[in-house]
Amino acid sequence: MVDNQGPLAKDVSLANPPSDSISELSWSPVANHLAMSSWDQTVRIYDVSQSGNGEGQALFNFPAPVLSCTFSPDGAKVLGGATDGSARLMDLVAGKEAQQVAAHDAPVRCVRFFGNPGVRDPIAVTGSWDQTVKYWDLRQDRPLATLQCQERVYAMDLCQNLLVVATAGRLVHVVQLSNADQIYKTVTSPLKHQTRTVTCIPDASGFAIGSTEGRTGFHYVDESKSSLNFTFRCHREMAASKNTQNVYAVNDVSFHPKYYTFSTAGADGTFAFWDKDAHHRLKSFPSVGAPITSTGFNHDGTIFAYAVSYDWSKGFRYNTPEHPTRVVCHPVDDVDCRPKNPVKR
C-alpha cells in the first residue's frame, strides 16, 4: 500500500530487501547505518541518506535464520543471533565473513552489546530459548558469565546499567549490570498475554513492554515510582459486528533518542507516536498493508525505520511468496515526536 499524499507520502523503501521475514532492525549509535536480520539467513547493512534512500553496504550470510541483530557502541561491528544457537560477529571495517563468537543449546532470540562508545572491546549479551543469558568477551570462546532464567527468553533489551529480559510465562527479569550474573528482581508482566517486545526507557529508569493482546505497558524499576506504572490499549480496531474489536499484537516499541517519546507498531500494519509522560498519542499513521515486525529511530531521531513483513502470527502456512517484505524509512517531522510539555531531564 502506497500513501502518495498522506503522512506516509515521503516514506522511502530500501532497495533489495531480504527475501523472507525481517526479525529486527538496528541503527548504528553513531551514523545512519541500518542493520536488518532476517529469516532468509542474512544480516544486511545499509548506508541511509538523510532523505531516507539507502545503499547496501554489506551482506553477511548465516547458516540459519537470524532472529536478532545489533550494532556495537562504536558502530564498527554488528552482532547477529540465529536459530542454530549461534551468535556471529560482523566486522564492517575488516569486511570478512561473520565469525561465530557465542553458542547456546537452543535458538538465540536476542543479542545486545554492553559497553560505552569509548570502550574498545564491549561485552556481547545473548539471550536464548535455552533459558539463559550469556555474556561474552569477543576475544574468548567461553562466556564470562551465564544468567539462568526461569523460562525461554522471548525479548531482551539493554540500556546503560539496565538489562531487561522478558521470558515465556510473562516473567520479566531485571538485571543491574554492575552485578551482571545476578537477577536484581523478577516481576510479572503487567500484560495478560504473551510478550512480544521489551524496550528500555533511554534513561534506564524502566522499560516498555508489548504483547499479543494489543496492549503496551510501562514499568519503572524503582519501586518508589510504581505509581507511574501504567498500561494502555493500542493496535485495535472496531470489527464489522457491533461491540467487538479486532486485536493485534504490539510487535515493537522504540524510543525517540531526544524526547523519550516512543512509537508502537503492530500486526495491524500501523505505527503511532506517543508521549508516555502525558499519556497522550502524538501522531497516528495509516496502515501500510501488512504487519510491521520491527522499528527504530536513528541516532538523532530524524529518521524512523520500519520493517514490513510476515510476523508469523498465523503460522507458517500464511508466509507465502506474495507477502510483502520491505524496509521503509520515514522522515520524522519534529512536531510529531516532540512532547507538548517537555519534562526536564
Swiss-Prot record:
Pathway(s) it belongs to: Secondary metabolite biosynthesis
WD repeat coordinates: 15-49, 59-100, 101-146, 250-284
Pfam families (alphabetical): WD40 (PF00400)
Cited PROSITE patterns: WD_REPEATS_2 (PS50082), WD_REPEATS_REGION (PS50294)
Induction: Expression is positively regulated by the oxaleimides biosynthesis cluster-specific transcription factor poxB.
Keywords: Repeat, WD repeat
Gene3D superfamilies (alphabetical): YVTN repeat-like/Quinoprotein amine dehydrogenase
Top-level taxon of the source organism: Eukaryota
Family note: Belongs to the WD repeat rae1 family.
Role according to the record: WD40 repeat protein; part of the gene cluster that mediates the biosynthesis of oxaleimides, cytotoxic compounds containing an unusual disubstituted succinimide moiety. The first step of the pathway is provided by the HR-PKS poxF that serves in a new mode of collaborative biosynthesis with the PKS-NRPS poxE, by providing the olefin containing amino acid substrate via the synthesis of an ACP-bound dec-4-enoate.
PANTHER family referenced in this protein's UniProt entry, alphabetically: MRNA EXPORT FACTOR AND BUB3
Full protein name: WD40 repeat protein poxJ
Taxonomic classification: Eukaryota, Fungi, Dikarya, Ascomycota, Pezizomycotina
